[in-house]
Amino acid sequence: EYPYTRSTRPNGHRSDFWTMTQVTGFGRGEEWSRRARYMLDQGLSGLILEYDLATTNGYDSDDPMVEGEVGRAGMALDSLEDLEAAFDLPFDKLKYLMSVCNAPQPVNLAMVIAALEKKGVDPQDFVLHIVNGILIEYTCVGRYIYPPEHGLRIATDCIEYIIRNHPNW
């Protein structure tokens, strides 16, 4: 009976296999998509999309400040078209998608939802987990785009949107 105490489902994790995931992210959307399809073909049921430092710091790939860093430690994301290319996936095999973007997360969240909808995929069909790590950047990484009070407001706005519009996430 709701509210469940061990999971979001009545039988907890006993009713389903664990979601197998692996972190990946490099290059552009097409390259990430090829790697993601390969991982799904190998039996993974979840994907963790990591973005490059240019993206997580709010830079476009053509900015001179990030020359040599684009696509190295994650996928470069400059536009909705990048995510559309990345999401050329067999979504029927995918149960879980994590998007790690931190400070630009509000924009990334909107782009992920828009790219899924353009692909004809209902975001409610699987679990989307976003890493909304504003404080991680401020306290652990030592770089940040927003001061903590503004970053927390933006992060809680994302949480409120998800609670209202995508409660199964």
Enumerate the predicted regions with their spans:
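Catalytic alpha/beta active-site cores
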Residues: 1-169
